């Protein structure tokens, strides 16, 4: 699904409503995992430990065909189809900066599973904790180097 730190209100709304609906299910009927993905803003701002990488290497022809279905997002000079495929390739290269590429395409997800396992978790606080870990990583690096 979408994630609750998405750039678009409609996408955030979808993620929240889905989480709320899953929370209404009996625990044994809930999915074992729930991931929120992002295309527009991307999730490369998250710490590597928080990112869930999804290997998108296979079937590039099928991926391109599926992206091409959304004519309204491809027509008129905005080539979201090419940008999406390019971003996946870039993630595959940049994710492991000191190793050789293991994939030719990666997309990142946010693990939303804790939000469906524990309905008492606050959705906003969950997002802020992820942002906080990223901020702490940057603070630590700057403290070490300055």
Language model region names:
Residues 1-27, 143-146:
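Active-site beta-strand->loop->alpha-helix modules in alpha/beta enzyme cores, enriched
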Residues 25-146:
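C-terminal accessory domains and tails appended to enzymatic cores
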